[in-house]
Amino acid sequence: MVLSALGFALMAALVKVAGLRGFPVLQIIAARALVSLGISWWDTHRKRISPFGQHRKLLFARGLIGFLALMCVYSAVIHLPLAEATILQYTHPIFTLLFALLALKEAANRATLLCIALSILGLVVILQPSTGLQESANLPPYYVFLALLGAAGSGAAYVLVRKLAPLEDSSVIIFYFPLICLPSALVLGWRDFIMPIGCEWLILLGVGVFTQVGQWGLTKGLALYKAGTVVAFSYVQVPLAAMLGLLFFNESLSVTSILGGSLIILGAWINTKDKT
């Protein structure tokens, strides 16, 4: 599970490197999707199942929402400090609950409500500019909004995956994400794409490769350990992101980000712990 967290943290760091080198978000998404599409297609071929599934409208919706969320998340990663962008992504349980309530008629228990309360409190701490502390996050509101929009998209995608899980093979659900992302990114962004030079090819390739490393580690972890243990280990991604931000981008965590991020992660942990 540490491998999974490291994979996702390195993926985010490479997204930031690519963005700072001038690569547009849609080109970074296309590079990731190209790698993921090849691996996902091979996985369905290995299982000897059709990659296109039966419930194509739901599968298409999952892919499209995931694509829109990824645009927001990657934009936030490029323009916000790496640790803060990662912390804001952990607010997705709020949105997962809302969408699950609307789409699946799932009621919230006390642990989930506590998770939401702590997440909102954590957001207030991170975003409050007049805390009286010398070190506040002082994050650009537009990219904070994009990060939260990305978390909302992730929440909606999780609900669709939950709805699709008993209907389709997991490999088919995974396949549709890059299947929608790649053509969407090409159609919307090809005019702005720039030709990579030298090591930039490896940076773009690395985004896709480390995404798969993260996914592989997560899948293996879920197969070997309880879900609560797996998710608890996934929080290692936050200090890893902070360390990578400090080493490669000269970023440091503010006091408000540490306090607010701790509340958000505590809420997510309580929510997960209650379900195991």
Set out the residue ranges of the language-model regions:
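Loop-to-transmembrane-helix transition segments
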Residues: M1-S4, T44-C72, P141-G150, M195-V213
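Juxtamembrane helix-entry segments on the extracytoplasmic side of multipass membrane proteins
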Residues: G22, A30, F52-H55, Q128-A152, ...
